[in-house]
Design a protein with these regions (language model features):
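Enzyme catalytic cores with a strong preference for nitrogen-chemistry domains
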Residues: 1-358
Length: 358
């Protein structure tokens, strides 16, 4: 009888211990659901304070892959050609004159500050269309020999190059090679990245004609802190200058466009994706795609871009919910681990007790 009572008490203790991890997990799930539901319940205002007319030029490339640039000036000439055609359409009344034009990342593979032919080509396009052009260009670092900067440059039709943004987060093994001296000796393929990109130190908030835009280059759209800082520094709309030619005919361009849609909703801002070979698109503040291009085509997208000044809840609280959920997850795992250890120790003690009783 006494043994039965002891056994019954042991079963009850095991049940309460087993419930520990389950309760911790349930609490974590409940908190995650509450945070998610709270986010969905917060309205995102998408009304525009005002709008600007934009044109996004997708000049296209000759071939996908690592050798997309081809010979010097090839990609630049494609974008100049498409912009000159836009200017002709404007002069003929077939297209409304935009307030500004956006070119993609790497639209000029030559530094326009060092190569007169690149400077003249860009200047000719800007003068023809008669409005500022945001030009994506590779620019030699002014002080560090051998380094290059990935920039977005505001090119005025009268004053020429002005404000610029330098990509803050170059891609390892794509735009720079970590431990180049050591790795290049054993991985010869790394020589296809001949120069390292130098990172910028500030956000890309610039006045492009009448619009105060936030420039974000390529995969920087994936980094919460870069996009959030750009909006908080005063960007009224976001521009993602990108070159997806090396990822042609893969899911990457669609993936990046989905990221642009996420950022639009997150920050309540219109997002313009300008790509050398596609996908270029205009995303409304609610995440809907207004216009988009096909890949590996030369195209020009025109649209009225809404500009906003209000900030969203996400802008104001930043990464706090992510940290809270991460801590809840870690604490839940720690609680489950500790409970499991106590359970195993109790099981060993009960086994020893039974052996002594026998």
């Amino acid at each position: 009888g006494g043994g039965g009572a002891a056994g019954g008490g042991g079963t009850g203790g095991t049940g309460s211990r087993a419930a520990g991890p389950a309760l911790a997990a349930a609490g974590a799930v409940a908190l995650a659901a509450a945070v998610t539901a709270g986010g969905l319940a917060v309205p995102v205002r998408t009304a525009a304070a005002d709008t600007v007319r934009i044109a996004v030029v997708q000049g296209n490339v000759q071939q996908p892959g690592m050798d997309f640039l081809g010979r010097p000036m090839l990609i630049l000439n494609n974008h100049v050609e498409a912009t000159l055609e836009l200017a002709e359409d404007v002069e003929a009344g077939r297209e409304e004159r935009p307030d500004l034009v956006i070119w993609p990342e790497n639209a000029s593979d030559l530094d326009p500050h060092r190569y007169p032919q690149a400077y003249d080509a860009i200047d000719r396009a800007a003068k023809a269309v008669g409005v500022p052009v945001l030009v994506g260009a590779l620019v030699d670092h002014p002080e560090r020999e051998g380094y290059v900067e990935n920039q977005g440059i505001v090119w005025d039709p009268e004053a020429g190059p002005g404000a610029s943004y330098t990509k803050q987060h170059p891609v390892p093994f794509g735009e720079y090679v970590p431990y180049r001296d050591q790795l290049s000796k054993v991985i010869t393929r790394l020589q296809r990245v001949p120069r390292d990109f130098w990172p910028g130190q500030s956000t890309g908030v610039m006045d492009v004609g009448p619009a105060r835009l936030g420039d974000v280059i390529c995969f920087e759209v994936a980094y919460d802190e870069i996009v959030r800082a750009t909006v908080n520094d005063g960007a009224r709309a976001l521009v993602i200058q990108t070159n997806n030619a090396t990822y042609g005919n893969t899911g990457q361009p669609e993936q990046q466009l989905v990221m642009s849609r996420l950022r639009a909703v997150e920050h309540g801002r219109a997002v313009v994706t300008a790509a050398t070979s596609g996908i270029s698109a205009v995303v409304a503040p609610d995440g809907t795609i207004g216009q988009r291009t096909e890949e590996f085509t030369q195209d020009v997208v025109t649209a009225d871009l809404p500009l906003r000044d209000e900030t969203t809840l996400s802008d104001r609280i930043g990464p706090a919910p992510e940290w809270v959920l991460a801590m809840v997850g870690l604490l839940s795992c720690a609680a489950a681990f500790a409970t499991g250890r106590r359970g195993r120790a109790h099981g060993v003690n009960r086994t020893d007790e039974k052996r002594r009783q026998q």
